[in-house]
Amino acid sequence: MEEKLKKAKIIFVVGGPGSGKGTQCEKIVQKYGYTHLSTGDLLRAEVSSGSERGKKLSAIMEKGELVPLDTVLDMLRDAMLAKVDSSNGFLIDGYPREVKQGEEFEQKIGQPTLLLYVDAGAETMTQRLLKRGETSGRVDDNEETIKKRLETYYNATEPVISFYDKRGIVRKVNAEGTVDTVFSEVCTYLDSLK
C-alpha cells in the first residue's frame, strides 16, 4: 500500500483565500477522477466523528493552537491509503503551508508530481471574499479579517512556491479570469501528466 502511494500522482494545490482553488479542485475531481483532500475538512471531520484523535484535536483547536504536523500527516496518509486503489491521483488542498510541512510530507507519504499555484491578485481575492461574505455567513469574510488572511497567506506561501520552483514542478495558473478560462489552463498542465 505504502508503495502505491509513492507511485501515485500527488498535486499540491496552493492559492489564497478567494483565489478559486476550491472550485478548481471540484472541477478537477469531476474531469480527472482525482481525490480532493483538504486538511481543514479532514480535521473538521475527525473532530465531529468523536474519535479519540478527534477529541484531542478539538481541545487543541479550541485553544486556538496549531494542530501538530504529525497528526495532520497521519490523517492525510490514512485518507490517501483508503483511496489509493480507486483514485487517479490526489489533490492536496491548502498544504503545505510551509517548507517544513512539504519536506515531512515527502518523507512520510511521497513526492508531489506538481504544485498547482492558483494565483489571483489581492484585489480580486478581496472582492470575491466580500461577495461570498454577503451570502455565506462566514464570519471571516469581512474586509479587516480578509486583509489579515491575505497577509498571512502571502508570508507563508512565498517560501513554499520558491522551494518547489527550484525543482521545476510549479505550474502557475492565472486565476483572474472566469472559472472556465482558469480551468482550461489547469487542464493543459494536468493533461501533460498522462
UniProtKB/Swiss-Prot annotation:
Its cofactor is Mg(2+). InterPro entries: Adenylat/UMP-CMP_kin, Adenylat_kinase_CS, AK1, AK1/5, P-loop_NTPase. The keyword Translocase does not apply. Residues 38-67 are annotated as: NMP. AMP binds at T39, R44, E65, L66, V67, G94, Y95, P96, R97, Q101, R138, R149. Keywords: Acetylation, ATP-binding, Cytoplasm, Kinase, Nucleotide-binding, Phosphoprotein, Transferase. Pfam families: ADK. Residues 131-141 are annotated as: LID. PROSITE patterns: ADENYLATE_KINASE. It catalyses: a ribonucleoside 5'-phosphate + ATP = a ribonucleoside 5'-diphosphate + ADP; AMP + ATP = 2 ADP; dAMP + ATP = dADP + ADP; dATP + AMP = dADP + ADP. ATP binds at G18, S19, G20, K21, G22, T23, R132, G177. One of its GO terms (biological process) is regulation of G1/S transition of mitotic cell cycle. Catalyzes the reversible transfer of the terminal phosphate group between ATP and AMP. Also displays broad nucleoside diphosphate kinase activity. Plays an important role in cellular energy homeostasis and in adenine nucleotide metabolism. Also catalyzes at a very low rate the synthesis of thiamine triphosphate (ThTP) from thiamine diphosphate (ThDP) and ADP. Consists of three domains, a large central CORE domain and two small peripheral domains, NMPbind and LID, which undergo movements during catalysis. The LID domain closes over the site of phosphoryl transfer upon ATP binding. Assembling and dissambling the active center during each catalytic cycle provides an effective means to prevent ATP hydrolysis. Belongs to the adenylate kinase family. AK1 subfamily. This is Adenylate kinase isoenzyme 1. It comes from Mus musculus (Mouse).
